[in-house]
Amino acid sequence: MQCLFLEERIKKEGCVVLFAEAFRPSFANIQGFLTTIAEPVSRLSLMHEYRMTYFSLGAAASASISVSEVIQFLDDHVYFFRDKCFASYRESVCAFAEMYMSRCNLARVVIDESRTLLECKDIVTAKTLLKDRVVRSLCCQPKETVGEDACPHFLLKSRAAARVVAERCVLLGYPLQQQYEYEKDTSIRNVNIALKSQTRPRPYQIAAVDAAASDGALRSGCIVLPCGSGKTLVGIMLLCKVKKPTLILCAGGVSVEQWRNQILEFASVCAPANNEEGDPSNSTTGEKVRTAAVGAARISCLTGKQKDEITDETDIVLTTYSMLVTAHKAQARCQVEGFEMNADGRGRNPRRANPKERLFQPYGLLIMDEVHMMPADAYKDSLGFINAKGVVGLTATYVREDSKIRDLFHLVGPKLFDISWERLASSGYLAHVTCIEVLTPLARRFSLEYLERSSELTSPQHGTPLLVMLAAANPNKMLCVMEIVKRHVAESSKILVFCDHIMLLKEYSKLLGAPVVCGDTPHRERLMIFSDFQSTSKVNVVCLSRVGDVSVNLPSANVVVQVSSHGGSRRQEAQRLGRILRPKEKASNGKPTDAWFYTVISTDTVEMSYAAHRTAFLVDQGYTCSVTEFNPDGAPEAAVEGVDDTAPGDVVSIRQAKLRGTFKKQELKCSVASPTAQGSVNPRSLDYQEKLLCRVVASWELDYQNATSQQNEPGVANDTATGLIDKKMKRARDETAEDIKREWNSGAQTTQPRGDFCRLPLQRLVGANDDVVYHES
């Protein structure tokens, strides 16, 4: 049955747009194939939008889907596609699919023990690639093809050259396929790892693993699953299926710890079945042989605070992206100094062995958690030095604010599996989330300062770091957050408060009496806070910085309050929403407990445009978002003292219904006339507002001085300039709000801010920059 509409945009945008009627019964039968050949753009409740692009067709070809199957699918399910009046459109779409899919999988990278080969399916493809100057320069001498029979191939200079060749081949229109036949590989030892009998994978997790590994072969690529859907278990299932030494890259130290714990929870890691390591029968001298390591002893973790030794018995290595870059730089530095980094630490210059040196030993499998981080310039250069035959990336946010997300096609591989939040939520695997934008007016003093700073801008940009911080520090936001937290604490909710500015994060900690978790929080203290939050009622609210965006496993959390964010980053929005997507315990009437996601926005500020960009992304993913206004000066609402005994249902359901009714109103008011906070924080106090404003402006001025001092004036010595800056910074710390206002008012009349600073693009100042990764090593 037909349920698709097609729009041809090949000449304008280089794609074919497909609109799907999601309400049709036949749509469920074709959604899997449609997601394979086209990239999902918008998934509303009734209509979905997909785009057939060069990359999606390449992914389809790598999944062994032919051009004829794609055309037959369009003939069967697109309205009017075979009508004579649309014959020209059909020919254009068929030619588009034929042109790209016919070139896919014509070449692949093959890695054996000592060589890196580029293998082609025919001699014509091999000769075409060798004509390119870049590809030819990366080949060993001689550059002629070897074995001009069924599979001609030629040698590459190094493993790192394979990444450059892969990128170049994509530009030439010959995307490479990387396939690893792990069952036939004898150059890398097998590991004895298997899922425990009590582990019960979900159907979509099994489908994701089968999409990557089947029939003894592993296809390199990316698996996209929503936050909270069990990506870590998918990675563990791949470990158990491939059964080869594996390197796992994580976002940070907490993520490494969580991966290690879940591997030990869901899988059994044992010594080789034939007991090659430590079998007494293998000893001919009668000496006592050490027993082979099992379990956690076969897992090594390398982070900034934990550096386990990587031995011959190590089956799994867990490390961070930052540690990978550090090891890569150390290896390059040692090579420049004139000796190679051997595993035993011996070279022409004797030195102590470093555990990081063995990160680049041969692996059968490389798993990259949060793979959307890999296209960053700081990381992708190090990827080429990892000697792994199969690569799989895991992510919940296959999106970046720049165009680098496309680089994953040649860095890792095509998208292998993708499933929407809506499908998992309807099946009960994820929680139903209520997304609410709360519009909060700026406090009077902050509003005047915001208008004054806005008028001083000399470039046509929409904001500066100071404007963003003024909007985030809005005291009325504090009142709003207090009100939201108060209502949910009364329902025994677990609440996460996100704020990107550390100074403001500490203010919210004082305001709510909640612990802070940021980059400076010690690892042990962080784990204790998360443990108390997860399993006790001692901690119900935690204030988090950007370190909580990824790899924080808190299934009990069901409320997120977002005070400030990283510009319009859609990735960050989805990741923070993912903290509460895990399914919650049901009430006694069988209904699931709701999850709540609040974004508190200062009206008439730059936050409005950023929030619109992020919310549009959530709507495209199928979430329902509503808007309410917070009135800090409105008449207080009557407090709810108890539960209506006449209402049907249990206490939890009634309270959830009352919360939904409260936030469906167009205006949210304080439940008490003058809410009081713990400690010295009182957002209604004019004295507190003045001090907070002073600190915000002074903090920005220090950042301004640091930014402008990087370019010294001509003729001024570095040490002199540094001394002047130190004096200015010391003076800025001692200034009051009146001093700062006087200085800026006088400066605005005589001179304008430095042109080079003002001409910085908005993307670099306050926009979302996905090359900046906020986590600890």
UniProtKB/Swiss-Prot annotation:
Pfam families: ERCC3_RAD25_C, Helicase_C_3, ResIII. GO terms for cellular component: cytoplasm; nucleotide-excision repair factor 3 complex; nucleus; transcription factor TFIIH holo complex; transcription preinitiation complex. Gene3D superfamilies: P-loop containing nucleotide triphosphate hydrolases. It comes from the Eukaryota. InterPro entries: ATP-dep_DNA_Helicase, ERCC3_RAD25_C, Helicase/UvrB_N, Helicase_ATP-bd, Helicase_C-like, P-loop_NTPase, XPB/Ssl2_N. Transmembrane segments: none annotated. Disruption phenotype: Mutants are much less tolerant than wild-type cells to UV light- and cisplatin-induced DNA damage. Residues 212-416 form the Helicase ATP-binding domain. Residues 484-631 form the Helicase C-terminal domain. It catalyses: Couples ATP hydrolysis with the unwinding of duplex DNA by translocating in the 3'-5' direction; ATP + H2O = ADP + phosphate + H(+). GO terms for molecular function: 3'-5' DNA helicase activity; ATP binding; ATP hydrolysis activity; damaged DNA binding. Keywords: ATP-binding, DNA damage, DNA repair, Helicase, Hydrolase, Isomerase, Nucleotide-binding. GO terms for biological process: DNA repair; DNA-templated transcription; transcription initiation at RNA polymerase II promoter. Belongs to the helicase family. RAD25/XPB subfamily. PANTHER family: GENERAL TRANSCRIPTION AND DNA REPAIR FACTOR IIH HELICASE SUBUNIT XPB (PTHR11274:SF0), RAD25/XP-B DNA REPAIR HELICASE (PTHR11274). This is DNA repair helicase/translocase XPB-R. The gene is XPB-R.
